Each structure stands twice: as structure tokens, then as C-alpha cells.
């Protein structure tokens, strides 16, 4: 599978998805750690891709997303943004509402 197809598949199969360095339990950079902490406070299920384990995705996603840095939060197929945007939305209560609405649209089996 081509890298771009893999990215599109990941985004379509995960209503809430973060591309990050490391994992939610063991983030490998401060930006990823802060972003995933905000997501975890929202108490909704989310997927993640560790870009350190997937150099092809790390190389191609910035061009596809037109967003140069990581982490990247994708919600319902749309790029929300990186760490600063995630934290700003969380502090304003917008992230919690967005994620709760999307999680309700896609109940876990």
C-alpha cells in the first residue's frame, strides 16, 4: 500500500486520530505529551500513529496535510491542528465538545 493511501485509510478509519512522536503512554516529545494529555482529559477513545515508527508517514503527512509539524490531530477526517491549537481549544472547552460530538457519532463496538 502506498504511503498516501495508508494515511488516508488511517484518517478514515479513526474518527479521532493523533499523529505523534511516541505513544500516549510513552510520548517521545514535549509537544506530543501535552497534546495527548489534553486528549486523554477529554475521556473519548482515540487512535494514534507513532511517526517515529513510520518514517514514510513522517515524511509524507506534512505535505498531504499542508501542516509541517507534529503532533497532528485529525477529527472526523479533518485536520484540527498541532499542539498549540489543541491546547488552546482544550483551555476554551472547544476540544471537549468537538471530541464528545464526534465520539457520539461513532460509538465503539
Curated annotation (Swiss-Prot):
| Residue ranges of every copy of the Glutaredoxin domain listed in the record | 4-106
Query: SUPFAM superfamilies, from UniProt?
Result: Thioredoxin-like
UniProt-listed Pfam families: Glutaredoxin
Tell me which Gene3D superfamilies the record gives: Glutaredoxin
Keywords tagged on the record: 2Fe-2S, Cytoplasm, Iron, Iron-sulfur, Metal-binding, Redox-active center
Stretches of the chain forming a coiled coil according to its record: none
PROSITE patterns given in the database record? GLUTAREDOXIN_2
GO CC list:
cytoplasm
Identify the residues that bind [2Fe-2S] cluster: 29
So which domain of life are we looking at? Answer: Bacteria
Q: Which InterPro entries match?
A: Glutaredoxin (IPR002109), GRX_PICOT-like (IPR033658), Monothiol_GRX (IPR014434), Monothiol_GRX-rel (IPR004480), Thioredoxin-like_sf (IPR036249)
Q: Which residues bind glutathione?
A: 21, 58, 70, 83-84
Q: Where in the cell is it found?
A: Cytoplasm
Which family is annotated?
Belongs to the glutaredoxin family. Monothiol subfamily.
Q: What is its biological role?
A: Monothiol glutaredoxin involved in the biogenesis of iron-sulfur clusters.
The record's annotation in NCBIfam families points to:
Grx4 family monothiol glutaredoxin
- Tell me the subunit arrangement: Homodimer.
What protein does this entry describe? Answer: Glutaredoxin 4
Amino acid at each position: 500500500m502506498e504511503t498516501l493511501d495508508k494515511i488516508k485509510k488511517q484518517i478514515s478509519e479513526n474518527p479521532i486520530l493523533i499523529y505523534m512522536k511516541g505513544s500516549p503512554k510513552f510520548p517521545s516529545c514535549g509537544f506530543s505529551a501535552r497534546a495527548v494529555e489534553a486528549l486523554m482529559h477529554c475521556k473519548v477513545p482515540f487512535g494514534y500513529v507513532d511517526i517515529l515508527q513510520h518514517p514514510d508517514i513522517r515524511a509524507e503527512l506534512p505535505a498531504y496535510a499542508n501542516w509541517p509539524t507534529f503532533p497532528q490531530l485529525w477529527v472526523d477526517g479533518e485536520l484540527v491542528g498541532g499542539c498549540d491549537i489543541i491546547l488552546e481549544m482544550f483551555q476554551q472547552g472547544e476540544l471537549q465538545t468537538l471530541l464528545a460530538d464526534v465520539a457520539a457519532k461513532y460509538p465503539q463496538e
